A protein has these predicted regions:
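A short, flexible N-terminal coil/short beta segment enriched in small residues
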Residues: 2-40, 64
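Short, well-ordered beta-to-alpha junction loops that form the rim of enzyme active sites
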Residues: 125-127
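Glycine-rich nucleophile elbow surrounding the catalytic serine of serine-hydrolase chemistry
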Residues: 129-134
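Cysteine-based protein phosphatase catalytic domain of the PTP/DSP
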Residues: 32-123, 138-171
């Protein structure tokens, strides 16, 4: 998809999301900007932030772009509908142990896709800053041997709106 087509598709999806949720991810970002791990000046949450050559993080709008580009899309936001290959809602209210089990399933699915296909994996939640970030952090920890600190730093380097929610999985 060329940049003009991507921009048009992104604008169209933002309009649909505005109608359904009464705000776009960009508008929500303005409200919660100060929680981010790095400066978010000029950052577009609708972009896919590539953690490495096969794993990306994005918001709901970016999920539509990721699907259109043929990527394997994982939706971790129970409240959103998107063109995804799997939907595995991540809810921190279920408690740390149950959430770690959910994260294990997501990481296992990511690993399976990476090992058995040539597709890129894109994980999204509504904003692309909490649940999707934690999913990718957990994958990096579980399958690439990164510490939680190192994994969060890797993600924050490419997605400055990332919010550290390791407390959700604390024992």
């Amino acid at each position: 998809m060329n940049s003009t087509a991507r921009r048009t598709a992104t604008d169209d999806v933002n309009k649909l999301i505005q109608r359904r949720y009464s705000e776009t991810p960009r508008e929500r970002l303005d409200y919660i900007n100060h929680f981010s791990m790095a400066s978010t000046d000029g950052f577009n949450p609708d972009e896919i932030s590539w953690v490495n050559d096969r794993i990306g993080v994005t918001d709901l709008v970016g999920a539509f772009v990721a699907a259109a580009e043929g990527n394997f899309v994982i939706n971790v936001a129970g409240e959103t509908d998107s063109p995804c290959d799997i939907k595995e809602p991540e809810d921190p209210r279920i408690g740390p142990e149950a959430l770690r089990e959910t994260l294990d399933r997501i990481a296992d699915e990511m690993h399976n896709v990476i090992e058995t296909t040539d597709k890129k994996v894109v994980v999204h939640c509504y904003m692309g800053m909490e649940r999707s970030v934690l999913s990718v952090v957990w994958y990096l920890h579980r399958y690439e041997g990164k510490t939680i600190d190192a994994a969060y730093q890797i993600v924050a380097n490419v997605r400055p709106i990332a919010i550290d929610h390791r407390s959700w999985i604390a024992t």
